[in-house]
A protein has these predicted regions:
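Non-catalytic, solvent-exposed segments at the cell envelope interface
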Residues: 2-3, 12-16, 22, 30-342
Length: 342
């Protein structure tokens, strides 16, 4: 387990960009189609360091915490979904300035036996250990920075995804992540077009000054013209505006899930058509075989639990930061990924 007392080495990075969240749900829906056909994973969770004196790791993926025993649930398959903003160059002192950032991060955990889904959202300003590189691609080692920058130190493709996957896995106490999917924001309008619009209720007043249509409590339909404002905009002059936006994105995800399932039930070819349309905006190491067959199962279950990494937003020396509550996160990991045993 990571050391909760580790110093936060805040690297000053000019990294204020807009968050992309709307792309994520389509990734989730697409890959629900894949999950049931993935063989039972044999990966073992790595041993964890002590989070406190009453927690320790024993053999065979079994740990003890507060006098109770927990074993990792081998029925789980975990996938990382990233929303990438690459329209603006990522301003880092080292690394690839044009790689973009993973400004929306979600982990989907699928129990292949119970057919249940849990989605964990990770604030883009989460401070955690990431690997950094110089302009020549040489590793500079690990340092604490915004988790969104892990992707930026790669190539904007496979390497970036692997770096982000490693950072997320480490944040979640080395939980195994079997696959990833990253979507660029330029595919955002395709999502609205594919389902013919997304009706939802505006959850807060964060957009009212930008567009009077988005008053708190208003019922609106997101389309190709207004979807970007709803899922991307935030006032960068306001502290913790990324957290406010993340809450708005969750509303979008739930609404899009409903629309996608209805569209699929009317037209089973919807998923495969959308997958093809998104190819030029997507990087993934996951296959697309038998998507439609699995969608039939996923449409009856949906996402059972939706969680956010526990922590607190603070103002850093240069930019907003999200500091994880290590003890609460550890307990959440036990709840989601482990089963209590004798």
């Amino acid at each position: 387990m990571k050391d909760s007392n580790q110093k936060r080495n805040n690297q000053k990075t000019l990294s204020i960009v807009k968050v992309l969240g709307g792309l994520i749900l389509v990734c989730l829906i697409l890959f629900l189609l894949y999950l049931l056909f993935i063989p039972k994973q044999k990966e073992s969770i790595e041993e964890k360091e002590k989070v406190e004196t009453n927690s320790n790791v024993s053999k065979e993926n079994t740990i003890t915490y507060n006098g109770k025993y927990y074993q990792y649930n081998e029925h789980l398959s975990n996938f990382l979904f990233l929303g990438i903003d690459s329209r603006e160059k990522t301003q880092t002192s080292q690394g690839q300035a044009n790689a973009g950032q993973s400004d929306a991060l979600f982990v989907l955990s699928w129990d292949r036996v119970e057919h249940s889904l849990t989605m964990i959202s990770i604030p883009r300003d989460t401070m955690t250990q990431i690997e950094t590189f110089d302009v020549s691609g040489n590793s500079l080692g690990m340092s604490t920075d915004h988790i969104s920058l892990a992707y930026a130190f790669g190539d904007g493709s496979t390497k970036s995804c692997e770096l982000a996957k490693t950072a997320v896995s480490n944040l979640l106490y080395q939980i195994p992540i079997q696959g990833y999917c990253a979507l660029n924001l330029d595919g955002l309008s395709l999502l609205a077009k594919a389902v013919g619009g997304i009706p939802l209720t505006v959850p807060d007043d964060s957009l009212e000054q930008v567009d009077s249509e988005f008053k708190k409590g208003a019922k609106v339909v997101l389309d190709e013209n207004n979807i970007e404002t709803f899922v991307r905009y935030r006032d960068i002059e306001q502290s913790q505006s990324a957290i406010v936006r993340l809450n708005r994105q969750k509303v979008f995800l739930n609404a899009y899930e409903t629309c996608a399932i209805k569209t699929f039930n009317k037209n089973p070819g919807f998923i495969s058509d959308l997958y093809i349309d998104l190819q030029s905006y997507m990087v993934t190491n996951m296959g697309s075989d038998q998507f439609v067959k699995i969608m039939e199962d996923a449409s009856s279950s949906g996402v059972k639990n939706s969680l956010t990494i526990p922590g607190e937003g603070t103002e850093g020396k240069a930019f907003d930061e999200y500091h994880v509550d290590d003890e609460k996160l550890y307990e959440m990991i036990l709840q989601v990924f482990y089963e209590e045993t004798e």
